[in-house]
């Protein structure tokens, strides 16, 4: 005989714990199931262990989806300020890093303990670690067959996330359930991920691994151009850092990315105008703008000797160098994949869901929340805010 609840939430991550705590505190009986032994591993490792738990600037414009309007309702009903108020209630010390990004002063564990306490307040029951073997629809709702027994509920919430970082337990469970109930899925792909390049083409830049600098980075055509100003990091296989993670969510295979290594300097004009006054050789002069190792590598890639005097270089060569540094175009051959992706773009098609409750329109009582849905935030706390907002929306909608 199965144990019955008002709701079963599968996935004890950010969205799942938020949903369970909200429903539980509204007097609903809730069971939270997860296949992992530890709670919310993604929270634990995020932000270098300090969890970038939200962003004060979070709004619909910071999210990607085939339906960009879908996230508006949930984000407006549970805002970054709402989550911050919860953090303050638990006296968790935090700081704003930049661009509205909020981090714990001490540890991401503070956020996990807070969410666990909120679940305890709602008398949420737990089954962890517990593998789900099968989900069935019944006349009374849903039945979940697990290695620890059979559980049933009028409502079932899928909060198992996407495919990112499989080493901490990511699986395609949410997509399996979506397919079982004939829901459309927007093709998942890695997002917020380092980009890679053809090994032979990248060879001259391998020695630059570890170099970091602020850049403008862009992709897309004139109508759909996306640009960010963030730090870029050279790696042995390509490019990473916040700039590249941001643009990776917008980049399409086969497209170029354009990097402006000197976003506030028109290098060609500066070099040509300074031919008579700049006494340094070209390498030393460029090293006033970018790390010396990068200056040397870029000069070599442009066929210019580092010890050349600026006055001895033609305007054409200087303009070519300037263009290559202000408008450096590269075509990635791929990304580092789900192994290093912070999130998954794509997921359950939002047209299948109610934007107010996250419930499947044609399957009463079935909900999808968090990263399992085709809503992907920018880098900087936006994806956690979507977890809180979508979890709150579903938790508020669950009925006895």
Language-model features, listed with the residues they occupy:
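Feature captures the FAD/FMN-dependent oxidoreductase FAD-binding
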Residues: 77-155
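A glycine-rich dinucleotide-binding beta-alpha-beta segment and adjacent secondary-structure elements
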Residues: 128, 297-376
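Glycine-rich FAD pyrophosphate-binding loop
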Residues: 24-48
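An anion/pyrophosphate-binding glycine-rich loop and adjacent beta-alpha core
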Residues: 37-39, 44-45, 53-60, 93, ...
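Glycine-rich loop(s) and the adjacent beta-strand/alpha-helix scaffold that form part
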Residues: 155-201
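Short hydrophobic core segments
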Residues: 8-10, 132, 151-167, 178-179, ...
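Glycine-rich active-site loop/strand segments that organize a redox cofactor
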Residues: 50-98
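N-terminal Rossmann-like FAD-binding beta1-loop-alpha1 element of flavoenzymes
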Residues: 5-32, 394-399
């Amino acid at each position: 005989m199965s144990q019955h609840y008002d709701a079963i939430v599968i996935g004890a991550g950010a969205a799942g714990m938020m949903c369970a705590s909200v429903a539980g505190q509204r007097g609903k009986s809730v069971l939270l199931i997860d296949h992992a032994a530890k709670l919310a591993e993604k929270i634990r490792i995020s932000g270098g262990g300090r969890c970038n738990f939200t962003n004060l600037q979070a709004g619909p414009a910071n999210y990607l989806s085939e339906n960009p309007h879908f996230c508006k309702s949930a984000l407006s009903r549970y805002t970054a300020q709402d989550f911050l108020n919860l953090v303050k209630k638990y006296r968790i010390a935090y700081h704003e890093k930049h661009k509205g990004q909020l981090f714990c002063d001490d540890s991401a564990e503070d956020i996990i303990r807070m969410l666990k306490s909120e679940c305890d307040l709602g008398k949420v029951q737990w089954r962890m670690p517990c593998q789900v073997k099968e989900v069935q629809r019944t006349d009374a709702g849903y039945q979940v067959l697990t290695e620890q027994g059979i559980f049933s509920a009028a409502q079932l919430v899928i909060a198992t996330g996407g495919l990112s970082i499989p080493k901490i337990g990511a699986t395609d469970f949410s997509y399996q359930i979506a397919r079982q109930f004939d829901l459309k899925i927007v093709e998942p792909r890695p997002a917020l991920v380092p980009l890679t390049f053809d090994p032979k083409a990248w060879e001259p830049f391998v020695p630059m691994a570890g170099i970091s600098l602020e850049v403008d980075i862009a992709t897309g055509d004139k109508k759909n151009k996306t640009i960010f100003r963030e730090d870029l990091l050279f790696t042995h296989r390509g490019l990473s850092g916040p700039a590249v993670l941001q643009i990776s969510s917008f980049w399409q295979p086969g497209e170029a990315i354009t990097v402006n290594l000197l976003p506030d300097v028109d290098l060609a004009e500066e070099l040509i105008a300074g031919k008579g006054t700049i006494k340094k050789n070209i390498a030393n002069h460029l090293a006033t703008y970018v790390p010396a190792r990068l200056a040397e590598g870029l000069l070599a890639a442009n066929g210019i000797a580092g010890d050349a005097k600026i006055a001895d270089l033609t305007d054409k060569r200087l303009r070519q160098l300037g263009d290559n540094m202000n408008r450096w175009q590269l075509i990635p051959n791929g990304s580092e994949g789900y192994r290093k992706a912070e999130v998954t773009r794509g997921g359950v098609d939002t047209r299948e869901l109610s934007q107010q409750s996250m419930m499947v329109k044609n399957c009463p009582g079935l909900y999808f929340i968090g990263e399992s849905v085709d809503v992907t935030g920018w880098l900087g706390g936006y994806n956690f805010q979507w977890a809180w907002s979508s979890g709150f929306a579903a938790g508020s909608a669950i009925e006895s």
